[in-house]
C-alpha cells in the first residue's frame, strides 16, 4: 500500500500536469517540471507559477517560493484545495497586489472621464457614451 507521503507527491505532480495542460490553451509549450524539483513548477510560459496541492495554507511562504524562481517574470501561486477535482479553471490563484495592479492597469487603465460631445454626460474618452450611446468615438 502506498504511503501517505507518496500519495501527496503524486497529487502534487498530477496537479502540476493538470495546470500545465490547461495553460496549453494559451501557451502551447507549457510543461510541468515534476514534483520536488527545484525551480519553476511549469516551464514554457511567460510567468513563474508555484503549484500547490496541500491541505495546509502558507500563502506567504508559497509566494516567496514562486518569487525566488521568477527570473524577472511575474510570479503567482496556483492552489488546489482539498475536495477540488482536476478542473484547473476552478483552482485558486494569488499574487502580490502590486503585481496584480500592473496587469490590471495594462488591461483596464484608469482613464480620466470626460464630457460627451453630444449630450454632456460623463464618459471615458474614446468610448461610447452610456447616456446617449454616441459621444466620443466615430461610429462611421
Give the location of each predicted region.
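Catalytic phosphate/metal-binding cores of nucleic-acid and nucleotide-processing enzymes, i.e., regions
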Residues: 1-140
Amino acid at each position: 500500500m502506498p504511503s501517505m507521503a507518496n500519495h501527496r507527491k503524486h497529487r502534487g505532480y498530477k496537479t502540476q500536469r493538470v495546470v500545465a495542460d490547461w495553460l496549453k490553451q494559451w501557451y502551447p509549450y507549457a510543461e510541468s517540471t515534476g514534483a520536488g524539483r527545484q525551480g519553476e513548477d511549469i516551464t514554457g510560459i511567460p510567468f513563474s507559477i508555484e503549484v500547490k496541492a496541500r491541505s495546509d495554507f502558507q500563502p506567504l511562504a508559497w509566494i516567496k517560493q514562486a518569487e525566488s524562481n521568477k527570473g524577472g517574470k511575474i510570479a503567482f501561486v496556483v492552489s488546489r484545495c482539498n475536495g477540488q477535482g482536476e478542473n484547473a479553471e476552478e483552482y485558486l490563484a494569488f499574487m502580490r497586489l502590486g503585481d496584480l495592479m500592473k496587469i490590471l492597469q495594462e488591461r483596464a487603465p484608469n482613464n480620466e472621464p470626460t464630457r460627451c460631445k453630444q449630450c454632456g454626460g460623463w464618459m471615458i474618452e474614446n468610448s461610447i457614451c452610456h447616456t446617449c450611446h454616441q459621444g466620443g468615438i466615430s461610429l462611421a
